[in-house]
Every structure is written in C-alpha cells, then in structure tokens.
Design a protein with these regions (language model features):
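N-terminal (or domain-start) structured segment
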Residues: 20-105, 136-141, 149-204, 293, ...
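Bacterial N-terminal signal peptides
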Residues: 8-14
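C-terminal lobe and pocket-closing loops
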Residues: 203-290, 337-351
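Secondary-structure end/capping motifs
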Residues: 261-327
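Sec-dependent signal peptide recognition
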Residues: 1-8
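N-terminal signal peptide c-region/cleavage motif recognized by signal peptidases
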Residues: 16-18
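Periplasmic solute-binding protein
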Residues: 90-98, 110-124, 142-151, 264-273, ...
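A structural signal for short loop-to-beta-strand junctions that line the ligand-binding cleft
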Residues: 80-83, 98-122, 128-134, 253-261
Length: 351
C-alpha cells in the first residue's frame, strides 16, 4: 500500500515537473549568428502568447547539421522542444549526409524569405572574369550568377555551364562574412550576397554598389515563384530574360529551382515532432504572434517583411515535387565541380 502511494506521488511530481518545464528552441548555430538572433527574437515574443517560458539552446556544429541531427535523434521526443531551422539546413537535407527528415515533423511556422545579390554598379555580366567569395548557403545564388554571366549554353547541360563557369569565374572558398563584405567594398570580389536585413544594413546607399537580383518568394497557393515585394523588379528570371532575350531553361536552372526553394521557403522555420500533443497549442501561439503588430514589427526588423507559411503538408508537397532524379544529380554535380563542395547523391529522397 505504502509502495503504491509512493509510486503515485513520484508519478505526480514527474507530471507536474514536465508540465512546468520551459519550452526550448533548438538553434543549430552559436549565439550571435543570423538564425540564432532570429531564434532569440522568436523566443522572447512567443512566450507572451504561449503563456510559458521559452528558452533557447544552441547546438552549433559543422554546416549547422549536428544540432538538427540531435533534435531528430533525441530531442524531438520531448513534448516542449521546438527546432529552429534555416535555409542551409534545407539544402543540406538535399545534398549532405544528415539524419533529420522534415517529413517526420509538424511545421509550426516558416518565414518565406529571400536572399539579395549585388554587384558593382555598371559591371557588365557578359564580359570579364568575376571573382566570387562563396561558401555554404551559396548553392542557388552562384548557380543563378552562372546563368546570368553565361546565358544560354549549347544544350544547357551542367557540363556546358561548367565550361563557361571555369572561363568566367574565380571561386574562392573559406572567406568569412566580414571579409566578404570588405573584399566587395574594396573591389576584390565582384558579387555581394546577403539576407535582406543585412543588405539594407551593410550595402544600401553605398556609392558604386548595385542591387543585382533577388530570387523572389514562393506563392504556395499557386505553387509559383513571385517577385519579392520588398525589392520590386529584381526577380532573377526577369533579369535573365532582359539580358539574354529568353527565359532561363536547362539542367542548371532545374537544379537551381530545387536548391532555391528548399532553402528560401524554409529559410527561418519552426518544427516539432509529428504527433507532439503541444504542436497545435504552439502553432496557435505562433499565429497570434504573427498577427500581433508589436511582435511582428520586431521580427520583421530582423528579416524584412516576408510572409509566414503554417500549412506544413502543402509546403512539403510543393518542395517534394521539385525533387527529381535528374535535378538532384545535377545539383550534386554542380556543387561538387563548380564549388568544390562535398555534396552526395541521395536516392532515398526520391521515395
């Protein structure tokens, strides 16, 4: 009898302790980086609407993969744990060895974001050698640059574009973000690449600098790419057609669309384990946060004003539709041979 009472008391304490535990946002970066700052802003505002404390736990690692793997293999089974993922995680899901799988999770909310590319004012895409300081996250950006510099190439195969790329581009890996900015301003590098907020902070209004293009954002309802309302008349496809007299097409373009949308449509996103009993509550709190003018203003000050997506099944279906054997293999080949990235082909993604 006493033993039963004791076990009951222990169980009650355990349940109360679990109920009182803080919600935790897992961020796969060290403090101070872009997604980490976004996660801190989300935590601060989300707890106002969820009615419970929300803390941030940083789990940094190579290419921001270990933290997401930790969530997948262990932490997602805690009912109060939320994963904060970024666009690089989306590209790594396609092209790197990872444990995590978006189709095992419930989407709580995703900001459909963009990336801004700049060049020196008056630089002619059709001539000269361009030096680009690249790195992780550049996969779709530099593919778009290659198409703008090279235009239509033979049968528009990956090999056709690699030939032009090697003739027109000097690709430099291993340069930090601050060094990239300084190198661009000093004329050492020919391309600038930033988040919308960083573009406005570091480049807007600087003499000799020119906003070159953006990728646009996904219109999920119609499953098409539309112009970024924050940067009108800068859509990559429109600029390409203006330069070359026809719309982009071919193998590199299909690989570009694959990595672009897997990066940008989930560039700042929140996930919980599928079947998590708290997911509906957290999702509703995120909806309230989005609709609150004070909270949303603080978030948009960091990211720019971009739409949120909370329909996980529709978003993942749209992204899944881009994964074909051809596009996946071409993305791997381009990343390996143009950038020197250790990308791998993952046939399991076709299932």
């Amino acid at each position: 009898m006493f033993k039963s009472l004791l076990l009951g008391a222990i169980a009650s304490v355990f349940m109360v302790t679990q109920a009182m535990a803080d919600y935790t946002l897992i961020v796969p970066q060290a403090p101070g980086k872009g997604t980490s700052v976004w996660g801190e802003i989300i935590a601060k505002n989300l707890e106002k609407f969820i009615g419970e404390p929300v803390v941030v736990r940083h789990i940094p690692g190579a290419r921001d993969i270990p933290g997401f793997n930790k969530f997948h293999n262990d932490l997602r089974f805690d009912d109060k744990t939320i994963m904060v993922a970024h666009g690089g995680n989306g590209v790594s899901y396609l092209l790197d060895k990872v444990d995590y799988d978006y189709f095992d999770y419930e989407l709580i909310g995703s900001m459909n974001n963009d990336i801004v590319l700049g060049k020196h004012a008056g630089a002619d895409e059709k001539s000269g050698t361009w030096t680009i300081a690249g790195g992780s996250g550049f996969e779709p950006d530099a593919a778009a640059v290659a198409m703008l510099l090279c235009g239509p190439q033979g049968n528009n195969t990956i090999d056709d574009y690699l030939k032009c790329w090697r003739e027109r581009v000097i690709w430099v890996n291993g340069v930090s973000g601050g060094e990239k900015r300084l190198g661009f301003k000093n004329g050492e590098f020919d391309v600038a690449r930033e988040s919308p907020a960083a573009w406005k902070r570091f480049y807007e209004g600087i003499e000799g600098n020119e906003l070159w293009f953006t990728h646009g954002i996904l219109d999920l309802e119609n499953n098409v790419q539309i112009a970024d309302p924050n940067f009108p008349n800068t859509q990559f496809e429109d600029l390409y057609e203006e330069l070359w007299g026809e719309a982009p097409k071919g193998d590199l373009y299909q690989a570009y669309k694959l990595t672009r949308n897997w990066r940008d449509a989930i560039q700042k996103s929140l996930w919980m384990n599928k079947g998590n009993p708290n997911a509906a509550k957290v999702k509703a709190a995120v909806t309230e946060m989005i609709n609150d003018p004070v909270a949303s203003a603080e978030i948009y000050a960091k990211t720019g004003v971009y739409p949120w997506i909370q329909d996980g099944p529709s978003l993942l279906a749209a992204l899944k539709s881009l994964i074909t054997e051809k596009a996946l293999k071409d993305a791997v080949k381009w990343n390996q041979e143009a950038y020197g990235f250790p990308s791998i082909y993952k046939p399991e993604l076709l299932k």
